[in-house]
Regions:
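The two-metal-ion catalytic cores of nucleic-acid processing enzymes
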Residues: 1-199
């Protein structure tokens, strides 16, 4: 079992981890642990400098903050460690990295001869096509709404013999299909996606 990503829900003190196991995505939840150490002459733990330390483990943000406040006059160690890293080191140390599912995509929009291309803040023109390469399937798929100059039948006839092209009557249907195709992607990468496709 190897992890892909993790999210820390501070409100519920739960760490949600996404794993890949046998090529499938799996979701796990762990109770957050807030661990830190403080100087204590009777402590059972040692710092890297040999100082005796006591270990404090809390299961909620509230308790953690309270314990840090109680011990604020002592020298603290590891009180700034994110609970996600603690969880990952306890549960996934020395695990192999997963084979990530990567999807590459590009979105094309219609063009208005008078106004030009639509800006993401004012998307006045519809999406006309989305191409997506699913690396884990080694498959390129093109989703498109036929141009206004062709009927659906004419567009289908034009595409005869070309694999992995899907035509749609409406932009919304095409977007729904795209979202379904990328559902199992761990990483999404796109051409000009940050500045335009996904503003």
């Amino acid at each position: 079992m190897s992890y892909v990503d993790a999210h820390f829900d501070r409100d519920s003190d739960i760490i949600r981890v996404v794993e890949r196991k046998d090529g499938k995505r799996d979701f796990r939840e762990y109770q957050a642990k807030y661990t830190f150490y403080h100087e204590d002459q009777r402590g059972k733990y040692k710092s890297v400098y040999g100082d005796p330390l006591t270990r404090i483990v809390c299961k909620s943000t509230k308790d953690f903050r309270k314990e840090v406040a109680i011990n604020r006059d002592k020298k603290l160690f590891e009180s700034d460690i994110n609970p996600i890293f603690q969880c990952l080191s306890e549960n996934y140390l020395n695990q192999d990295a997963p084979k990530l599912n990567i999807a590459f995509f590009d979105i094309e929009t219609d063009f208005d001869p008078e106004r030009g291309f639509a800006d993401p803040s004012d998307p006045f023109m519809p999406i006309t096509s989305i191409s997506v390469y699913l690396q884990w399937m080694e498959t390129m798929i093109c989703l498109a709404v036929p141009p206004k100059t062709l009927t659906m039948d004419q567009a289908k006839k034009t595409l005869e013999g070309i694999e992995n092209v899907m035509l749609f009557e409406k932009e919304g249907q095409m977007i729904d299909t795209f979202l379904t195709l990328i559902e199992d992607a761990d990483i999404l990468s796109g051409w000009n996606s940050e500045g335009y496709d996904i503003p």
